[in-house]
Amino acid sequence: MAVGKNNNKMGKKGGKKKAVDPFSRKEWYDIKAPNMFNTRQVGKTLINRTQGTKIASEGLKGRVFEVSLGDLNNSEADFRKFKLIAEDVQGKNVLTNFHAMSMTHDKLCSIVKKWHTLIEANTAVKTTDGYTLRVFVIAFTKKSANQVKKTSYTKTSKIRKIRSEMISCIEKEVTGCDLKEVVSKLIPDSIGKDIEKTCSKLYPLQEVYIRKVKIIKRPKIDLGRLHDLHGDSITVGADGEKVDRPDDYEPPVQQEV
């Protein structure tokens, strides 16, 4: 039987580990939007520094960033969101390209109308540079100028004709364009305005919008085309600065090693 108390306390195995700040191993990269938008500097993103075989720039490729069109074009009120995907890294700049577009949930809820017919259509179209897009459009019927009746419902046969006309307009607007031109049309929503004008011959429409656009098939990344989209935003990072020296300059001889 042990008598007394053992004052020799044994330390715990391994001891207490020192807390390491996880942000000390990370670095910031600038997110650059294509030149279709007014604001080129979208924001910043974090990634772990290059360690061994884990290269930081490779980990950034494929990241998707969602940005409001209001922030991209410096407008106060806009209800569309663009998704940009990182395709290349130049120095500390992440070069992005268009990935998808959608409307905000609040806007979709605000345009739904009672006593009107909701008409939706979607189709897959291919651009000239090899992208396959699925485009969704939404529209509502509208009262005629001299209409007395409270409701503005239309027949199913006419809905089919309107839907067919919508798909024809989308194919006409997208098929002959590359991705850059398509995005340039999505920013002011000129496709939705053309659909409203064309389909109003069949039945008066209102609140016609391109509701969503997503890429369902993309070609192999063309870095030359991507760099053309970013142009002036590409800067090559260097550790030092260029120094002008005369043609007969000779470096000094090092005396000691």
Swiss-Prot record:
The source's superkingdom equals Eukaryota
Task: Supply the name of the protein.
Answer: Small ribosomal subunit protein eS1
**Lineage of the source organism?**
Eukaryota, Metazoa, Ecdysozoa, Nematoda, Chromadorea
Tell me which stretches of the chain form a coiled coil: none
Region called Disordered, residue ranges: 237-257
Question: Which gene is the coding source of this polypeptide chain?
Answer: rps-1
HAMAP family associated with the record: Ribosomal_eS1_euk
The protein's UniProt keywords, in alphabetical order, are:
Cytoplasm, Ribonucleoprotein, Ribosomal protein
One CC-aspect GO term: cytosolic small ribosomal subunit
State the PANTHER family in the record.
40S RIBOSOMAL PROTEIN S3A
Family indicated by similarity: Belongs to the eukaryotic ribosomal protein eS1 family.
Q: Which organism is it from?
A: Caenorhabditis briggsae
Give the record's GO biological process terms.
Answer: translation
Respond yes or no to whether keyword Transit peptide is given for this record. Answer: no
Return one GO MF term: structural constituent of ribosome
Q: How does it assemble?
A: Component of the small ribosomal subunit. Mature ribosomes consist of a small (40S) and a large (60S) subunit. The 40S subunit contains about 33 different proteins and 1 molecule of RNA (18S). The 60S subunit contains about 49 different proteins and 3 molecules of RNA (28S, 5.8S and 5S).
Compartments in which it is found: Cytoplasm
Composition bias, kind Basic and acidic residues: at what positions?
239-248
Coarse class of the primary localization is cytoplasm
Q: What InterPro entries does the record point to?
A: Ribosomal_eS1, Ribosomal_eS1_CS, Ribosomal_eS1_euk
